[in-house]
Amino acid sequence: EIFVRPRGPTKNRGMAPRAQTGGDTARPALDDLAYVQKDDVLVVDGYNIIFAWPELKKIAADNLDAARAALVHSLCNYQGMRGCRVILVFDAYPMKGNPAAGDKEAGVEVVYTKEGETADAYIEKLSYELGKSHRVKVATGDALEQIMVLGHGAQRLSARELKWEMEQVRGHMDGYLHKKS
């Protein structure tokens, strides 16, 4: 034998290898929303989500403003149930002379980037700054953007994961309203 430890060769202690889990990962139940902190921030890449979700993509094909409004409405419900701050970022960089603009629609902060600035660049800076004092989640379907925000300490949500979370919140909200009536 080339290498033998000082106390003899390594022995098999009868431990079984860990079981492989399937593709589904367990998620926390949304019945108990206590794991959400008030200083949580969700940053959403607006157009990326619109064109990743079939129902919003269909609306956007006819009317982009209506698709943006539908996303804001969905995020408003999500924010109300989760109690977190939501920042929705849209690209506005191709518009000549466009200053950065922000507005609050139904509690959701909506940001249009300034001329020459992409939503990705804005989200990277925002996640870095907010990450110093908040728990930040960034929702985007852009894999490169997900890697960048992970580097800043933010959590990432794919478009599919955000949709799943929003459906869970919607179901929780419907159940809550049903109990009240």
What do the PLM-derived regions correspond to, one by one?
Residues 1-2, 11, 17-23, 29-44, ...:
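Nuclease catalytic cores that cleave nucleic-acid phosphodiester bonds
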